[in-house]
Amino acid sequence: MSFDLASRLASRRAEDLYRQRPLLESAQGPDVVVDGQPLLAFCSNDYLGLANHPEVIAALRAGAERWGVGGGASHLVVGHSGPHHELELALAEFTGRPRALLFSTGYMANLGAVTALVGKGDTVLEDRLNHASLLDAGLLSGARFSRYLHNDPASLAARLDKAEGNTLVVTDGVFSMDGNLADLPALAAVAQARGAWLMVDDAHGFGPLGASGGGIVEHFGLGQEQVPVLIGTLGKGFGTAGAFVAGSEELIETLIQYARPYIYTTSQPPAVACATLKSLELLRRESWRRQHLAALIARFRHGAEALGLTLMDSFTPIQPILVGGSRQAVALAGMLRARGIMVGAIRPPTVPANSARLRVTLSAAHSEAQVDRLLEALGESWRQLSSSLLAEIEAEEGDDA
């Protein structure tokens, strides 16, 4: 029997779920060129505006001149260079933990941490809305895998009462499609009371959250005792690439010995680690970026609510606008693009059925005037979409008459 890939692709198209890759023809930033069209972008995860920072670029250039381009080998052979080691030390100090370990991607960090810590005879409990990489890690670990109700400590407690072996509770810090925060104090209390470890993937929290950009753990004033396993990515708030796990000496040594995505892959280019060291310095030093970003978020929410748009409970840079149907979300994104604004339409299976949305993301690189331009375009596009839907309903009623 042959693979019928054509019918699978046709089904995706028919359901308005077909994904296509926009071609970026400029550097990252608010003003981009995509598929030949100049656009004002509100869909990047470059929350602090560091991806195209001149000092970060200079650090990358200097790093390449000193260390070359490729990592050359895995960390355990001859690929663990000076910049990698220096960055791990800096990230450990930044997170207030004894050690940190670099991974090439956030997906690999999540997969490596979960599969190294639990296996057959153990238990993994995850939030239902966790990132796909966390869910995949739980399934691939071989441990007993279950999902608790979103951000619900009582649901977690009920599942913990049935857990077996070593138990790992896993949650996003900031949920990437909703923008809300995990209730870490409550989740940590429930996990600790039952002898489980809590692992937090704070991909979207590092940079925007916390007084010094230390993410959700700093935001809630928690430490290693409450959150033994802390994951961070470097391609969002840091503006570079890669990821890390921070924790105890024993945790990091365990990952070095058992995390297959760490052991069996070439290290990231050393120059990227040089760039990240500079971006970490800027992230900590330039607190105005977080302050400006917070002001933009408040400005956007006030304007969007005045337009009657349905927002979610988020004070993070992720500001979803609930639309409902996939076709309507795609249409609204297209109307914005016709007005020179780029916002991503998020559809199932990334989000639950009938909860398609526009995922607006704000950056410290945006200006107040650019946010106002987005709001103006949203108002015009929303009215256009409403008129189109009304016309379709009237046409259908006419056909039924």
UniProtKB/Swiss-Prot annotation:
Keyword terms, alphabetized: Biotin biosynthesis, Pyridoxal phosphate, Transferase
GO terms, molecular function: 8-amino-7-oxononanoate synthase activity; pyridoxal phosphate binding
Top-level enzyme category: transferase
PROSITE patterns: AA_TRANSFER_CLASS_2
Required cofactor names: pyridoxal 5'-phosphate
Residues binding pyridoxal 5'-phosphate: G106, Y107, S176, H204, T233
E.C. designation(s): 2.3.1.47
Annotated positions binding substrate: R19, H131, T350
NCBIfam families linked: bioF (TIGR00858)
Biological role: Catalyzes the decarboxylative condensation of pimeloyl-[acyl-carrier protein] and L-alanine to produce 8-amino-7-oxononanoate (AON), [acyl-carrier protein], and carbon dioxide.
Protein name: 8-amino-7-oxononanoate synthase
Gene that this sequence comes from: bioF
